[in-house]
Amino acid sequence: MAPDDFIEMIGNAAGKICADYNLPASVCIAQAALESGWGEYVIGNYNYFGRKWNRLGEYLELPTKEYIDGQFVTIQDKFQSYSSLDEAIEDWCVLMTEEPAYADALAEWESTWDVEAFIRAMAPVYATDPDYADKIISTINANNLMRFDGWND
């Protein structure tokens, strides 16, 4: 899917749902774009985020690349499956706001309202790729994704 088409598909839903959780939709959209290759590689149903199985609901077990001990390796892992795009976005929001592993990132966000600081605190928890934060930031900037952040209306 072309980036503009992907952004059109997810942008407004992410903007609305992320605003309900007081989170930056730009980060949500950029992560979905990166994890799914702009919608080309969706895992199961609506898993645009590459979200690992949370032990609730249905999952698919698939090979995935992870960065371990300084190199990318392929492992088998379980990935979440969703019934709708909105459910996937909401699950991302719940992950960011309720999962203890993201507490520092959430605290950084709530104290600074700095999207880049939030990304840099969140990225090492979310992904093993050491360049993940830079990739998210680049995707946001290249596609003007901050226009979907609720406080930029």
Regions found by a protein language model. Give the residues of each.
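Catalytic cores of secreted/periplasmic lytic hydrolases that degrade extracellular macromolecules
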Residues: 1-153
